[in-house]
């Protein structure tokens, strides 16, 4: 069992039950999944960029990503329907907790001029989205082997009913929010 999962079951559930006056353990918000997405507009001209992105994401998450394709054609971007334009990974259960642990304790502190993450990126239902400008913050990525700096989106999906509950849950997991 992942370290954060154990911490959640032993310490966070009683804490959240006390803070939000839940009567039942099943009411307590929990992590459902983490979606890591990398959109690559440059993949239209150069397919090799997509291959390196898939390899990097597999190393970061520990799971093979799926290649996302364009839903419809856009002439202005020289994009045709079905062209590969990115990759995504959905993490659940132990892999999700392991990834969150590495993100909070290792990767985010490696961001340059890091002052904490914004508390305003919740969607209204307790889910949090975070943008990372470069994949180099992850220690698994070898600096010498990357061909291009790519950003990625990380969405943390919770069962929380409100942003306040979601923020309290993520704070207990150690997410470094700005004030």
Curated annotation (Swiss-Prot):
InterPro entries: Ribosomal_uL5, Ribosomal_uL5_bac-type, Ribosomal_uL5_C, Ribosomal_uL5_CS, Ribosomal_uL5_dom_sf, Ribosomal_uL5_N
Known partners and oligomeric status: Part of the 50S ribosomal subunit; part of the 5S rRNA/L5/L18/L25 subcomplex. Contacts the 5S rRNA and the P site tRNA. Forms a bridge to the 30S subunit in the 70S ribosome.
Name of the protein: Large ribosomal subunit protein uL5
A GO molecular function held by the record: tRNA binding
GO cellular component, one term: ribonucleoprotein complex
Matches recorded under SUPFAM superfamilies: RL5-like
Function summary: This is one of the proteins that bind and probably mediate the attachment of the 5S RNA into the large ribosomal subunit, where it forms part of the central protuberance. In the 70S ribosome it contacts protein S13 of the 30S subunit (bridge B1b), connecting the 2 subunits; this bridge is implicated in subunit movement. Contacts the P site tRNA; the 5S rRNA and some of its associated proteins might help stabilize positioning of ribosome-bound tRNAs.
Coiled-coil stretches: none
Protein keywords: Ribonucleoprotein, Ribosomal protein, RNA-binding, rRNA-binding, tRNA-binding
Residues spanning the signal sequence: none
A Pfam family: Ribosomal_L5
Entry similarity comment: Belongs to the universal ribosomal protein uL5 family.
A GO BP annotation: translation
